[in-house]
Structures are given as structure tokens and as C-alpha cells.
Swiss-Prot record:
Keywords: Acyltransferase, Heme biosynthesis, Pyridoxal phosphate, Transferase. The modification N6-(pyridoxal phosphate)lysine is found at residue 244. It comes from the Bacteria. It comes from Rickettsia typhi (strain ATCC VR-144 / Wilmington). The active site is at residue 244. PROSITE patterns: AA_TRANSFER_CLASS_2. Pyridoxal 5'-phosphate binds at residues 185, 213, 241, 273-274. The keyword Acyltransferase applies. One of its GO terms (molecular function) is pyridoxal phosphate binding. This is 5-aminolevulinate synthase. Pathway: Porphyrin-containing compound metabolism; protoporphyrin-IX biosynthesis; 5-aminolevulinate from glycine: step 1/1. Its cofactor is pyridoxal 5'-phosphate.
């Protein structure tokens, strides 16, 4: 192994030298005290987890999980292809189809798998299909399109004019699919969904939208931005996750019967892997049902988002301004971003993980703040004042949001 260890060590050392080495903190979350967690025998406040609404600890969701555990046991017993469908996963798929006003749905073990295996399989099902993908699409989308080996075009981030030019360059009779996200996880910007839908109609293309960061949070029932804009019925495939706003785990797609059935019969990421256990699918179903009728969590969430953004404006903290709940604080240097994260945790009891290249472009290294309904005014003030002190200590300049947005967009274009 010595020869191979040398290769591994060289790879690790290179990442360390670039300030990109990732250390995973050992945390103990507290279901009865969200958003607190225990770290090295100290209580800390978490500001970076994707349990957006705290549904992982909601009493209805936890009780549903307990009941399913006692009724069905821990595991699912295998693949659906061999072991069949547990009734709980069929109920979940019915809820998801209704959530997005689609005929049916298909559940996967994660959002990554849902994107990866669905997109790769579409290329097997539809001969000569051409992919059109936003340049900042998630790694799971990139993986699926890449493994499909199909013809692909990458359009500039959120640039519908560039997208149209690329569409114009392809034979109108060739099958096409436009793949994009409703909200981009690292900058929080929304896609121009209606413009993309119009282009898809004009150039005879399918549409595939990733709503993982918006389901549960936007729309009357929590159906995401497509529901908020009342255009779910104009999008061919809506993909989402159960692991963020719904507080469990898993991913899914929703569409018409024929498309879903074709994916079910083709996608290796569905066929050859153990299905979600009933303890998870049942909990997810109850989480979705609750958020379909309750706006309390969404309203409180938006209130906290607004308060935090106002606080950052007041202290001139350089966050990337957007219309979503995702609040990136741009540091612009990998070493300093890591230091800010470590100082917040060790000196102030605040946990915010830094985000460095390759997750974001070089020069736009950042902290990504994720507010929840459980974050208090005191927590907001503590975070803001801690950042001001740390920025001063590390000689990081405070800058206006307007100047920052221009600077970051130039990085993205470059």
C-alpha cells in the first residue's frame, strides 16, 4: 500500500495547501432543544443545517416514525423490484404527486440519486436527447448528465438569452430537455422559471426542475417555487427532497404516469438499491401532510430570514442579497473563511460551516447561513456581533450588499 498511500497523501496535502481541507465536526443535535447542539461538552447554536423548518423534531413526524418502527421494524427488507412496495412508500408517493399536481411520483434514497439516475436514464429512454443545463447546477445533475454521455450544452447562470441561443443551435426536431434549479443553494438566487418554460415550449423541450431547496418552504401547500408561481402543471418533471424542509431523508421525482413508469423500469439508482424503510417514508408523509395545511412554520421562517438580513444590513456584513431564505456571507478567501468558521464555533458557540472551492468558485468562498423558525432575536444579534468582531480581528472588510453583489456576479461570469 505504500505506493498508493503516497498518492493519497499527495492528494490530501494539495487540498490542505489550498485551504480546502474539510473537517467534519462531531455534534450531538438536541431534538427537544432545536437549534441547539452539543459540541465538545458545550452547547452551541447551529446556523447551517438544512432542517429548514425543524420538522425532524416535530411531534407529529417523530410519533409517526415511532409508530411505523413498532409496526414494520427498522429496515425495508430490500429493493422494491424484488421485495415489493410497502404500503407506506406508496402513500408517500401519492402525497408527493398531489403536492406538485402531478399524476404520480417515484421515491429514491436521496435527492442526489433522484437527479443522477433519472437524468442518466432519460438518455437511455429518449434516443438522441440533448441536455441544456445551467452552469451552476448541483453536482448530482452534472453527474447524471455526464454519465448519460448524451449531447449537452451548458448555459450561463440564469441567463435565458444564452439558453435561447443554444436552443436555436440545435435542430428543432431533436428531443431536448432543460435542467435547472428553482433556487441555487450556494447563492440563493431564483431561476427565471416562467421564462425557461416559455423557451421550452418554443423549442419543443422537456423541463426538469430541481426544487430541493424550496419544497416545504414556498407555495400554499409547500410545493416550491413552481407552486408559488402557479406553473407546476407546465413543468414536465419536478424533483425534490425529503431531507431538508421535511426533516427526514430521501429524494423523488414527480411527473406523468408514462415517464415515471419508464424511469422505474430503467433507472439503476432505483432498481438496484434498497428502498427507504417505512420508518422514514411514514415520517416523511406526515411531514408533508402537516406542511400542506400549516403555514405557521413558513411564516415564522420568513420572519426570521427578514430579521437576519436586516441585522446584517445594519452591521454592514457582506451577505449576498437575494429573495430567498439562503444567506451567503462572502469572505473571498479559503483560509480566512475557515478561520471565521472555527472562531465562531470555538469562541462564540456558533456553528456555521465554511464553503470553499470546488463547491463555490475561487474568490467567492463563504459562510452559508440557514435561518430556521427556532432562531431567536438574541441568536440573530449574537451572530451579527460575533461576525463584526471576527471580521475586525482577521482584517476582513465590511462592505455594502450592493457592492458585494456586483463583485460576486463578476466572479460567476468569469
Amino acid at each position: 500500500m505504500s505506493y498508493y498511500d503516497t498518492i493519497f497523501n499527495k492528494h490530501i496535502d494539495k487540498i490542505k495547501s489550498e485551504g480546502r481541507y474539510r473537517e467534519f465536526k462531531s455534534l450531538k443535535r438536541q431534538a427537544d432543544n432545536f437549534p441547539f447542539a452539543e459540541y465538545e461538552d458545550k452547547q452551541i447554536v447551529m446556523w447551517c443545517i438544512n432542517d429548514y423548518l425543524g420538522m425532524s423534531k416535530h411531534i407529529k413526524v417523530m410519533q409517526a416514525s415511532i409508530d411505523a418502527l413498532l409496526e414494520y421494524g427498522v429496515g425495508s427488507g430490500g429493493t422494491r423490484n424484488i421485495g415489493g412496495n410497502n404500503i407506506s412508500i406508496l402513500e408517500l408517493e401519492k402525497e408527493l404527486a398531489d403536492l406538485h399536481s402531478k399524476e404520480t411520483a417515484l421515491v429514491f434514497t436521496s435527492g442526489f440519486v433522484a437527479n443522477d439516475t433519472t437524468l442518466a436514464s432519460l438518455a437511455k429512454i429518449i434516443p438522441d436527447i440533448v441536455f441544456f443545463s445551467d452552469e451552476l447546477n448541483h453536482a448530482s445533475i452534472i453527474a447524471g448528465i455526464t454519465s448519460s454521455r448524451a449531447e449537452k450544452y451548458v448555459y450561463r447562470h440564469l441567463d435565458v438569452q444564452h439558453l435561447e441561443k443554444l436552443l436555436q443551435s440545435v435542430d428543432i426536431n431533436k428531443p431536448k430537455i432543460i435542467v435547472f434549479e428553482s433556487a441555487y443553494s450556494m447563492d440563493g438566487f431564483f431561476s427565471p422559471i416562467k421564462d425557461i418554460i416559455n423557451l421550452a415550449k418554443k423549442y419543443n423541450a422537456l423541463t426538469f426542475i430541481d426544487e430541493v431547496h424550496t419544497v416545504g418552504l414556498y407555495g400554499k401547500q409547500g410545493g416550491g417555487i413552481s407552486e408559488l408561481l402557479d406553473c407546476s402543471n407546465q413543468i414536465d418533471i419536478i424533483q425534490g427532497t425529503l431531507a431538508k424542509a421535511y426533516g427526514t431523508i430521501g429524494g423523488y421525482i414527480t411527473s406523468n404516469y408514462n415517464l415515471i413508469d419508464a424511469i422505474r423500469l430503467t433507472a439503476p439508482g432505483f432498481i438496484f438499491t434498497t428502498s427507504l424503510p417505512p420508518v422514514i417514508s411514514t415520517a416523511a408523509t406526515h411531514s408533508i401532510r402537516h406542511l400542506k395545511v400549516s403555514n405557521e412554520e413558513r411564516i415564522k421562517h420568513q420572519e426570521v430570514v427578514t430579521k437576519l438580513k436586516n441585522s446584517f444590513e445594519h452591521f454592514n456584513i457582506p451577505y449576498l442579497k437575494n429573495e430567498s431564505h439562503i444567506i451567503p456571507i462572502i469572505i473571498g478567501d479559503p483560509i480566512k473563511a475557515t478561520k471565521v468558521s472555527n472562531m465562531l464555533l470555538n469562541e462564540y458557540g456558533i456553528y456555521v460551516q465554511h464553503i470553499n472551492f470546488p463547491t463555490v468558485p475561487r474568490g467567492t468562498e463563504r459562510l452559508r447561513i440557514i435561518p430556521t423558525p427556532a432562531h431567536t432575536d438574541k441568536m440573530i444579534n449574537d451572530l451579527s456581533t460575533a461576525l463584526v468582531h471576527i471580521f475586525a480581528e482577521l482584517d476582513i472588510e465590511l462592505s455594502s450588499t450592493k457592492e458585494l453583489n456586483k463583485e460576486v456576479r463578476l466572479h460567476l461570469i468569469a
